[in-house]
């Protein structure tokens, strides 16, 4: 099963940067799942792409995107800056809400590792915008204030 060809590459403008993403859009989509991946991972993760492909086959759209630019990812501390990751996820979620193709879809988060912490924090900030959160091997403890 080739899970890498089922998406379109997009660029999401966030403040002064652009985040790269892979959007899979299901026909008659039931919702869209935003992936908030963990430290050291990316939108190209074979594991997350498999999950996104599975979701597509079951009627869910998905967006795998990099929370950090390539330059930012070279700074190790950024991978654990939960506030930065949360801010990015909130802004991408708002972008999804403003996009004509996705604004009508219920939104869920799929977080792994440190991405689970940013998913929980972002969902708390966005009130009732997020309808579901999945944490796979997550670090929810990092979502709590220090």
Predicted ranges, named:
Residues 10-105:
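Serine-hydrolase catalytic machinery in alpha/beta-hydrolase-like enzymes
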């Amino acid at each position: 099963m080739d899970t890498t060809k089922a998406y379109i590459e997009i660029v999401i403008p966030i403040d002064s940067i652009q985040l790269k993403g892979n959007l899979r859009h299901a026909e008659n989509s039931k919702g869209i799942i935003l992936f908030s991946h963990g430290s050291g991972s990316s939108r190209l993760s074979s594991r997350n792409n498999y999950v996104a492909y599975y979701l597509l086959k079951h009627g869910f759209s998905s967006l795998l995107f990099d929370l950090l630019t390539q330059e930012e990812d070279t700074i190790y501390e950024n991978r654990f800056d939960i506030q930065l990751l949360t801010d990015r996820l909130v802004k991408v979620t708002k972008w999804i809400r403003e996009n004509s193709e996705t604004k009508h879809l219920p939104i869920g988060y799929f977080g792994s590792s440190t991405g689970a912490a940013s998913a929980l924090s972002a969902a708390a900030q966005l009130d009732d915008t997020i309808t579901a959160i999945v944490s796979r091997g997550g670090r929810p403890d990092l979502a709590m204030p220090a």
